[in-house]
Structure formats: C-alpha cells, structure tokens
Amino acid sequence: MKILNNKNTLSLQMLYAGYHTAGKEWCYNNVISPFSRMYLIDKGEAAVYMNKKKYNLSAGELFIIPKFTFHMYECDNFMYHYYICFFDQLIGGQSLFDNTEIHYQFPATEMDRMLMLRFLELNSDCAIQDPDPKTYDNIPDIYTVNQNKVNYSLNKEIESNGILLQLFSRFLGNTQLLESQSRNQYERLAKIFMYIDNN
C-alpha cells in the first residue's frame, strides 16, 4: 500500500551528517530535539534509552531516534558510527512518526552502508562540531543550519534527497498511514515548528 497520496507529500531536510568516534564521554541525559537522528553503527557498542526501553547498539545496525523523543546515551568504551540528523514533514498532514509503525533498530545491509557513504560524500561539510546535544539541537537557526554549505548541482541534490528517503524508508513498518494519534506530549509543539517553518 502507498504511504503517500496527493494530500500527503513527505519532505525530509538534512541538518547534520557525518562520522563520529564516540568514547566514554558519549553519555548525555534528558535529550529531546525537534529533529530525528539516524545511525549506522560501524564499530564498538553503546546504548540508547528511550520509550522506557534500553536499545543496545552494536556494529552493523541501523537505529533511529524520532524527533521529540526523550532519550539518553550511554557508552562504556567506544562506538564509531555514521549519522544523519533530519527533519521530516508530511505536507498536508503530520509527522510520519505519528502516523505509521516504526522499526527503531535492525541489521543494516551492504546497500545501506553504500548509501550512507554516498550521502556523506555528497554532504561532506555538514558534521556536528561538538557532540554534546546541548550545543546544537535547539539553536535559534536550527531550520537553516548547514544550508549555506550544501551547494551542489540539481542532479546531486536530487540524489542526496533520494538516498535520505531510501534510508528512512527502511525504518517504516506498516506502510499504510495510521489514524493520527499523538505518540508523546510534544505533538502540539511539533505542529508549531512546522507552521513556523512553512510561513
């Protein structure tokens, strides 16, 4: 079944993308952001706590943290990972996270890795400079961060957007849009952000 129709067009906007070598300092509590985080674990192990559950992250896995989700990070040794931070929006609708089943964690394929590497090649100057979420996840210019660094041709822009959509699609379970319902108390805040972004 189709996810989208003429009333719902999915839009994804990349904010940050890069490769990070996390150590024992990768322990941050009470993190909540207006954007989502996608990870591909390369080496090592760590953990993320969200939705009252512990997710153990290990090499070769894809993992996603939806926007407006309280979570915590924990790393006892090291974890090297690729990441993409992005906004999602259903134009004419709501956040896709509120309207479909999401698989948060699963094994990555070789194609997933190739797509991630190509995406970072296309967006090579958009890495997070300071890994502490307090320094970047709620800054005033969050909706335009790194946009001045993304200066590629139309064909590469389409390729970049297509790769992000492909990777994001891997997390979707039930491909039929569910009846709108709030997953957390920040849905109203998310709508405000979407309104500001569109006006």
PLM features per residue range, with description:
Residues 67-92:
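Ligand-binding loop in jelly-roll beta-barrel domains
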Residues 42, 85, 120, 172, ...:
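Short, locally clustered residues in the helix-turn-helix/winged-helix DNA-binding domain
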Residues 107, 127-139, 145-199:
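Short, Lys/Arg-enriched, Trp-marked, Pro/Gly-tolerant hinge/linker segments that flank
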Residues 27, 48, 83, 93-94, ...:
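Short acidic, gly/pro-rich beta-turn/loop elements at beta-sheet edges
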Residues 110:
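Phosphate-binding site recognition
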